[in-house]
Design a protein with these regions (language model features):
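Cytosol/matrix-facing juxtamembrane amphipathic
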Residues: 2-65, 114-181
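Small-residue-rich hydrophobic membrane-insertion segments
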Residues: 62-142
Length: 181
């Protein structure tokens, strides 16, 4: 029987793939609404996706997502004051890394784990880190394919089983693919 007050070490990592910025933003907002901070959200996307969706269109409203994407790309904090919640989250997280050879942006606790692996181990380290977080290898392969196709992978280590169920439901409702806990 699941106890909704279990610690995060016993609660699942919820992961999902989002094919567009709008669905990723809504999923991120569902996490934020439950009191999770930007440093608790793992985001993986290609550098091309970051440039396409979070590069600072002056017609957009400032948001957390765009700034976080900018920092993940190594270009600093706010980017012209114009992006979404995920981008600001990318910028606000203390640890985010750009992997130039792979064209990949990683932010959140996962970035810290990868940074600890050292630059030489990042390529294999990403798959290993995701598998190490309890994500089955076949799902990691689907996520990798989705990232290459312009998607955004989000992951959150839930604090409670109730939170995990809530995130899974909300992310699926917001067009998340391969959403699991």
């Amino acid at each position: 029987m699941s106890n909704p007050n279990t610690s995060s070490s016993e609660s699942p990592m919820v992961t999902g793939l989002f094919r567009d910025r709008e669905s990723a933003e809504r999923a991120y907002e569902s996490v934020s609404a439950r009191g999770y901070g930007r440093d608790e959200v793992n985001l993986l996307m290609s550098d091309e996706t970051r440039k396409t969706h979070f590069s600072g269109d002056a017609s957009e409203v400032t948001s957390e997502l765009g700034s976080k994407a900018a920092e993940g790309a190594g270009i600093g904090g706010a980017i012209g004051g114009t992006v979404g919640a995920i981008a600001a989250a990318l910028a606000a997280v203390g640890t985010s890394i750009a992997i130039p050879g792979l064209g990949l942006i990683v932010a959140g606790p996962l970035a810290a784990a990868l940074a600890g692996a050292g630059a030489g181990g990042l390529t294999g380290g990403l798959v290993g880190a995701l598998v190490g977080w309890g994500i089955p290898e076949e799902r990691v392969i689907r996520y990798e394919k989705g990232i290459k196709e312009g998607g955004i992978v989000m992951g959150v280590k839930s604090r409670t089983a109730e939170d995990a169920t809530h995130f899974e439901s909300e992310w699926k409702r917001n067009r998340g693919e391969d959403v699991y806990q």
